Every structure is written in C-alpha cells, then in structure tokens.
Amino acid sequence: KYNGRGTFFELGQNMNLYPDIVKSVYERGHEIASHTYQHAQLPKLDATALDEEIKKTQEACFKACGTEPTLVRPPYGAKNDTVKSAFYSYGLSMILWDGDTEDWRYSKVTNGAQIVCDNIIRDAKAKTGDGNIVLIHDIHENSVAGLEMALDQLSKEGYQFVTVSDLLKYKGHSEYK
C-alpha cells in the first residue's frame, strides 16, 4: 500500500503455530527474522537451552518459508558475549532498534492507536540521516492501527519503508546495535 516492506522478528513458536501467515508475509516481500523461540531472557539460559532457542527458530522459519533468518533481535534487547557468540555460530546478525514505541503500554487504551502513531513518527524522525529502526509489535490492535496511521503520514512526507537487510546494505553495516 505504501510501496514499502518491513522486517518481522518472529518467535519460532508462533511460526510453528501459524506457518501460513508467516509464509504469506514472506511471499509479499517482507523479511522474516528471528526473535528466538519463546521470548526467553537469553543471558539467563545455559548453553544448551540457548542453542535450542536459536536452532528451533531457524527450523520453524525454514519450514514456513523455505529459508532461514539471517537477522535476530534478542528478546528485551538482552544480550551478553555468550548470546552474541551463539548468534554468530548460526550466521545471524544481531539487530536492535533506534526507537521503542512502547506500544505494548497502549494495547488497551482508548486512544492507544493515536499514541502509537505519534510514537512511531517521533522515533522515525529522531535521528538525523537516513534510516531508523523502530520497534513495533504486530500482536496488538492499537499497534497495527497506529502503524497504518503513521505510514500514511510519513509516506506523504517522503519517507520510504525498507527491510532491515536493505537498510543495513544502504548503511554499509552487517549489524545494528
């Protein structure tokens, strides 16, 4: 609709539950990335559990889309050297964000969609230069509605919407922290 694409950092357990939705999103040109399997606090896991979080998500994505993710966003942004090494062992580049809309706070608020819209616009414009990564969750109705409103306004202002991989290529980076 806005001639753009996005990156969806998906939980492996959700990819297993809803493979048709994941495949549909992927086939429409969006990027599917890893958010690990169950949204665990990764630095608190032992090496075996950490490996399972990553491996099971890679497998779930391959099963749904026919391809494995190359990007990962650790739940809560929580990471340490062990987590980073585990990601790298799977060839995953770790991605964080520039702006957190905190959309989960407004999931049940009457004017939540407008608040989320305002936060998306604020975060999209927060840094000078080209390209920001804005954290939004696709599981809340107010987030989806707020995103639609923000995309409408930002597209009228000339903003473009690209996948994280495309942004990284443009900026000449392999990761975004």
Model-derived features: where do they sit?
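Terminal accessory/targeting
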Residues: K1-G6, D130-K177
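Active-site beta->alpha N-cap acidic-glycine motif
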Residues: K1-P69, M149, Q153, Q160, ...
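Active-site-proximal beta-strand/loop segments in catalytic clefts of secreted hydrolases
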Residues: F9-Q13, T36-Y37, R73-A78, W97-D100, ...
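Low-complexity, flexible helical/coil segments
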Residues: Y18-P19, L42-A47, E68-L71, S107-V109, ...
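A broad, structure-centric signal for solvent-exposed, well-ordered loop/edge residues
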Residues: V22, I32, K79-D81, S143, ...
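Hydrophobic aliphatic residue packing
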Residues: V22, I32, V116, I133-V134, ...
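Alpha-helical scaffold elements lining the catalytic groove of polysaccharide deacetylases
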Residues: E27, A40-T67, A78-D130, S143-G146
